[in-house]
Structure formats: C-alpha cells, structure tokens
Amino acid sequence: MVEFLILSFTLIPFVLILIQPDLGSSLIILFIGLIIIFLNGLNIYKIISGIIVLLAAIPYAWFYVLKDYQKSRVLNLFDPFSNPLESGYHSIQSSIAIGSGGLLGKASEYGTQTDLLFLPETHTDFIFAVLAENYGFLGNLIYFVIAFLLLSRLIKITLDLHLHSNRLLAVTYVIIFIVCFLINIAMVSGLFPIVGIPLPLTSYGGSSLFIYLIIFGLINALHNRKTLIAN
C-alpha cells in the first residue's frame, strides 16, 4: 500500500513535468521515487522485474520518444566537440572554466570563461564552474567539506528518528538533496547530460532556495518532535 502511494505521488509530477517537456527533471523525480520505494522494503523480485522493464524500454525511448535535441545532449556527453557551437557548447566552456582555475583560482585576476561571458548560466546551473574558476581546487575542496558536513548532519538526524514514517519522510528529503547535488556537479563536470538542475543552496533562484529551506525545516521539525516525545 505504501509503495503504491509513493509510486502515485511520483508518477503524477513525473507525467506533468514530462509534458512540459522537461525530460531531465521528470526522470530525476522518477529516480528519486524508485529509490524511496526500494528503501521502504520492496520485494527483490519486483525490483529486478522493474529494472528489466526499464532496460527493455531504453531502445524504444531512444528511437520513438526522445527528440533530436535530447539525443544530441546524450551523445555530446561522450563527444562534446562533435557539436562545439550548439549542444556541446555548455559542456566545453564549463570544462575549460573548471580546468583553468588551477589550484587557487583566478579570483584575483580575470576569469576568462566567466568574466568574458563565454560560460552561460553562470549564476544558476553552472555556478559550480564559476566557483572552480575563481577559487580553484582548494576552493572546491572547502566547498565539498562544507557540503559533506551539512549532509552528515542531515543523515545523523534521519538515523536518529524512531518512527518508520518519519524516517522515510526524512530520507526522502535527504535523497532529493543528494541527487540534485550530485547531478549538478556531474553535469557541470561533463559526466552527465545537461539538465536544468540547480546546485542546492548555491545556485541563484528564490524558488530553489525556498524549497530547500522548507526541506531542512521539516527535517528539523521531525528531529524536534522526536526529542519532545523522548522527554
């Protein structure tokens, strides 16, 4: 019953966002929903059956569902220089920005990719490339340490929850944060197709920041409720 409810609440936004069309965001929502169902204790045979169905659907989706620009994004993941001025442009400029940052970055100099506007969407989807060019490897390392500390705290709070429903809810929020964080970093680094996923708590955008603040507030509320019950 729980799996059915989770799947229902996953498929509704998946279909609506897919119709927009926004294939990347819809697939991420579906992926997060499937992870939650798996963590809720879905039968292993059902999991294997679902994986087989998804794998079998890939050829059909490639030839009959995906549009040309969506296919080009996937192909450019392997060879962005095949179309350097169109679909591969973002990946190339982002990789150059990350690589040119070096160890300490160019914050005291002039960032070629960001300041000269070669890199698009510098304040939203590709903000990590801007950080890499301006503050280099050391700046990225500090950024990852801060993100790791935040994530560690979220996971600790989640594991401390006793009620299964509360823990499942908190796990959902943590997975949303992890998936969006990793996909954005992989996308900017050229390890994932370009999708419109902002970097949590870093990319410019009121709605994105507002949602993550709500998520952290709900996790904190679950933690406080557990503490009150214990006392």
What are the language-model segments listed below?
Residues 1-90, 129-189, 214, 218:
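Hydrophobic alpha-helical transmembrane segments of multi-pass inner membrane proteins, especially
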Residues 15-17, 100, 191, 198:
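Residue-level marker of motif borders
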Residues 22-27, 106-111, 122-124, 141, ...:
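Transmembrane helix boundary and interhelical junction motifs in multipass membrane proteins
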Residues 98, 102-138, 165:
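Long extracytoplasmic/lumenal interhelical loops at the membrane interface
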Residues 182-231:
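A juxtamembrane structural motif centered on a specific transmembrane helix
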